[in-house]
Amino acid sequence: MSSADKVLSILSLFTPARPAWSAEDAARELDVSLSTCYRYFNSLVASGLLDRLHRNQYVLGPAIIEFDWQIRIADPMLEIAKPVMLELLRAAQGPGTVLLCRLYRHKVMCIHQESNRAGDGISSYERGRPRPMLRGATSKVILAHLPTRTVANLWRDHAAEAVGLSHSFEAYKAALKQIRRAGYCITRGEVDPDRIGVAAPIFGTGERVAGSLSIVLQAAETSDRLLHRLCTLVVAATRDIAWASRRATRGEPASPGGAAVDRALPPQP
């Protein structure tokens, strides 16, 4: 591991469960000398990636907030997806939240959400918060397009999440195969109670799965007819996003997001 990798590995120590670290604890955790760890911490503080609190405690620094702001205004996928997500909300016919998520290492990360009912708790997840790997339409539709060995490792590493989903990995793998064939995934109450999730995969370079788009609705207000219609719309939306993203990557102009969803929606009265 290079020195740069060792410095950056310190950032992975900071989690919601443990947001503050001392240099002494970090040195023990990473198995490096205390003097080396202090040198790493000082470099991260100087760059703004860490901030020092009292009593030799460190937390994530303000530079991360600045980077997040830059991503929000410069990420081409976000720019393309936002109008598409708003069109999906228009089709929901009730309270809903649309989530754009990316595959990040071995995590599914929410990078943007749009809701038509702010603060009503339609979905418990938000930007920057990882979603469960094995549960929920958002994650399962991504897993359905990953290599079997990768899914097997995730099943092993996140076994607690699998409780109540399938009695074995083989059964879970068979369910993912059905999702892959269908092109979308529907789940009920797997992440948030009394919620229905509908998701479709977003493919990137080389037709590799890069993320997913999903809509979360209140189960009591979602008819089978609406659910069937939303499946079609979500799949159309992901194709819109993938097509426009490929054009943007090549430096070509992309048509405004939501075109496929617009075509699938009935005309306004």
Q: Which residue ranges define each predicted feature?
A:
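A structural signal for short hydrophobic beta-strand segments in well-ordered beta-sheet cores
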Residues: 50-51, 100-101, 202
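Short helix-to-loop capping/linker segments positioned immediately adjacent to catalytic or ligand/cofactor-binding
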Residues: 87-91, 96-99, 161-166, 182-189
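Signal-transmission/dimerization alpha-helices at domain junctions
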Residues: 144, 237-248
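Extended hydrophobic
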Residues: 164-238, 256-257, 262
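Short, highly charged C-terminal tails/helix-capping segments
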Residues: 247-269
